[in-house]
Amino acid sequence: MKTNCTICSALAFLLLCSYSVCSGASEQSSGLHTENEAVSIVLDILRSNDQEMQAAAIAMVKEMPGAEVTEALAKELPNLSAKSQVQLLSALGDRGDVVARPAVVTAVKAEDQSVRIAALRALGQLGDDSSVELLAQAAAGAKGAEQKAARDSLYRLRGQNVDKVILAVIPKAEAGIKVELISSVGQRNITTGVAVLLDMAKDSDRKVRTASLRTLKVIAGPEHLPALVELLIGAKSSSDRTEAVKTIAAIAHRISEKNGQAASVLAVLPSVKETVARCSLLNVLGRIGDNSALPVLTAALKDENVDIKTAAIRALADWPTPEPTAELLKIADSSGNKVHRILALRGFVRLLGLASDRPAGDTIEMYKKAMNLAPNAGEKKKVLSGLSNTKSLAALQMAAGYLDDESLFVEAGAAAIHIAGGIYANYPQQATDMLNRIFKTTKSDSLRQQAQEVLNNLEKAEEN
């Protein structure tokens, strides 16, 4: 490849000039003269079509000292091609001289998207609190890489007043910009913003409310739970309630005393009479999983309001530990409400899969009860799916009992294969026999393939 000799010479001169300026070998006036020549050479190279030289020149720009150099380069930024602007913007950002900020701000509004993206990235390095609104506006109005560049820069802006400005601008901003600023509060971990976001969680715009609740999950602490519970009680929509429940549960789990995690919810529950709000509080009790709330949920099962009963069952079904297992089995077995029976059965099966000190034999007996209570093939499939995570010979035998059932053989086979792989170390013969049986007899190509893969993997493990 031929290289422009003039540019080669210019670059060599640039290297010498940069070294001279950096080392202080020249007198002050001579140094200034050299800087001006160096900038001129860089700009000539950036205006050329020689990519190798441009890359070398940009690398040199990052090393050339002096705010005067930055200012001269920034001044010429609009006169360069889009590609050269992108390169120079990156170099200006790395230089860190704030004198380039006005030129970078102007470039944020360039027609060429690649220039806008480069300018947004550079603003993350050169910007301060005056850049907050510009970056939030860019993030709200853009998509893809441009939006990501604006967000990333907003999240990493430096300066002691940046966080304060973000919080001050939020209440006055348009909805889309509010959302971006609120998200930045979480990304920047601005814990002083809790009060602002509690207020924004009541905003008329759904997206603003959602963003506020999600960010509060990050920056709020247990001391804010009473206020968050009040937000849940007054939530405007089901989506608001869903987000509030997630936020409250996440923060409650940070309380070290497990039996005190639900205290803020339990404190207000007796005084809340409105059905939707009461159901929401029961829901969050299930997510928190504080055992001191179990008597409250058990009492709610006897409520005359069917919605309250349903919420209590759902809460027990969501419990993070196996404690409500017996209560759910009772409901699944004896409730006169079909929906309640199914909800309880599903919760019962879910809890059977949680870690416990229950003997393996007792667990299998409970799965058998669940199969007997399952009203249709769909619910029986859910039971077999839960059974597949139980690693015992009895579980393998139970799954095998449904291999000949036309409506269940696929789920039974999948469960048996999974269990066989899990118990092979203790029961190699039984596991191998089951896998071979499925491989030879199943009508499902998928099951046959799964069985063969497990057999192959077990064989390789034995060889090693």
Residue ranges with predicted function:
Residues Y19-V21, N464:
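Eukaryotic intrinsically disordered, low-complexity regulatory tails and linkers enriched
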Residues A38, L228-L232, Q261-V268, A332, ...:
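HEAT/HEAT-like alpha-solenoid repeats
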Residues S9-Y19:
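Bacterial N-terminal signal peptides
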Residues S26-E35, D44, E52-A67, E71-P78, ...:
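Structural detector for internal amphipathic alpha-helices that build alpha-solenoid repeat scaffolds
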Residues M1-A10:
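Bacterial N-terminal signal peptides that target proteins for export
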